[in-house]
From Swiss-Prot:
Its EC number is 6.1.1.21. This is Histidine--tRNA ligase. Homodimer. Its main location: cytoplasm. It comes from Thermosipho melanesiensis (strain DSM 12029 / CIP 104789 / BI429). The gene is hisS. It is found in: Cytoplasm. One of its GO terms (biological process) is histidyl-tRNA aminoacylation.
Length: 419
């Protein structure tokens, strides 16, 4: 027997209502803010992610699913959604239709990580990209969209953490101070931090092993240039005026190399040590880095599996999927075709119908309808058809009535609306 690959999930049945809930909410919130959906390929050229995410990041070094295709090209299953979106923006000359460009995506991503609750090797993200604005209004909008989305899900136990990691100018001085701070600790830090000390010193602040050194490290907010400091203060001021709750975290740097300026993460209080449910920030240099014109941009992404756990932990009620409103049972050879016609009439009027396609008696058909959680059952029998009637049965209460053939659709709709 074949089994699913480790780190993947089959999503079906009761779980689907959570996926519909989160995806539908994401689409509604992005609609309110003028974002359009984009769907990019699941695999891209490997170099796209090496160039954008950063050669020394854990994602590129350890986590990417990379392979050679039959044309000997290096291909990678996308580990995140921003780089493919920006590649599509450049390749399709979206700048020609005007800026800023607001895009969102929902889809699977792939990283070779140790599977654990809410963290799979194939996982799903909802993300937005706001391309073309350097204003603090854009930074605030991204955070406001994230906050409204989470509130619309009914979540309350979350924290938005924000920081500014500055520009290349102010980061240069900060990196010097950070190197000085860690210079006498290199024999004590983890192997990853030893390597990052010379390749990307900022990534030491993202270490989950040497946390005692991280908390005492110099704060980048003390080294921001005037422009970055002004941008950070303006963004916070807008969030304050909009009553958006957030916490400043001067050690927040994010795990991808393309970020600059404002960065933020969202953590949920009921998810334990792995509490992050999303994050994002500015990436003003990424489009130029990937071959386009210098274009200020920012965005965020959230893990859908993590969001589902958060929704369940907070006990948020999620509406059942109302797929199976009516089960149509039939008895006798001559009743089959009429039962099919009745089913199609109901569907023509927007009523979902499950039609019996098995050789079963009435008792077995009713039992199957109950398993499917059908609300009503229409019983089409030869004897009833001779009298030009069918039987409509409430599957929850057992109440049933006879309906004349011409009134089936109207009466069925009334019974559905009453429930």
């Amino acid at each position: 027997m074949y089994k699913k690959i480790k780190g993947t999930d089959d999503i079906y049945g009761e779980d689907m209502k959570y996926w519909y809930f989160i995806e539908n909410t994401a689409r509604e919130i992005t609609r309110l803010y003028g974002y359009s959906e984009i769907r990019t390929p699941i695999f891209e050229q490997t170099e796209l992610f090496v160039r954008s995410v950063g050669e020394e990041t854990d994602i590129v070094q350890k986590e990417m699913y990379t392979f050679k295709d039959k044309g000997d090209r290096s291909i990678t299953l996308r580990p995140e959604g921003t780089a493919p979106t920006i590649r599509a923006f450049i390749e399709n000359s979206m700048v020609a239709t005007g800026l800023p460009k607001r895009l969102f995506y929902i889809g699977p991503m792939f990283r070779y990580e140790r599977p654990q609750a809410g963290r799979q090797r194939q996982f799903h993200q909802f993300g937005i990209e706001l391309i073309g604005s350097s204003s603090s209004l854009a930074d605030a909008e991204a955070i406001v969209v994230a906050d409204r989305f989470l509130k619309s899900l009914g979540l309350v136990d979350y924290t938005i953490k924000i920081n500014s990691i500055g520009c290349e100018k102010c980061r240069a001085e900060y990196k010097k101070k950070l190197k000085e701070y860690y210079s006498d600790k290199l024999d004590k830090v983890c192997d990853d931090c030893k390597r990052r000390y010379n390749t990307n010193i900022l990534r030491l602040l993202d270490c989950k092993v040497d946390v005692e050194y991280v908390k005492d490290a110099p704060k980048i907010t003390d080294y921001l240039c005037d422009n970055c400091k002004k941008h950070y203060e303006e963004t916070k001021n807008i969030l304050d005026k909009l009553d958006i709750n957030y916490e400043e975290d001067p050690l927040l740097v994010r795990g991808l190399d393309y970020y600059n300026g404002i960065v933020f993460e969202i953590h949920h209080g009921k998810l334990g040590a792995q509490s992050a449910i999303g994050g994002g920030g500015r990436y003003d240099n990424l489009i130029k880095e990937l071959g386009g014109q210098q274009t200020p941009s920012l965005g965020f992404a959230m893990g859908i599996e993590r969001l589902i756990i958060a929704v369940k932990k907070e006990g948020i009620p999620v509406e059942e999927i109302k797929n199976n409103e009516v089960f149509v049972a039939h008895l006798g050879e001559s009743a089959r075709i009429e039962a099919i016609k009745i089913s199609e009439e109901l569907r023509d009027n927007g009523i979902s119908v499950v039609f019996n396609t098995m050789e079963r008696g009435l008792s077995a058909q009713l039992k199957h309808a109950s398993r499917l959680n059908c609300r009503l059952c229409l019983i089409v029998g030869e004897n009833e058809l001779e009298r030009n009637v069918v039987i409509l049965r409430n599957m929850k209460t057992g109440e049933q009535i006879e309906i004349e053939r011409d009134y089936i659709v109207g009466t069925t709709r009334e019974w559905i609306d009453e429930q």
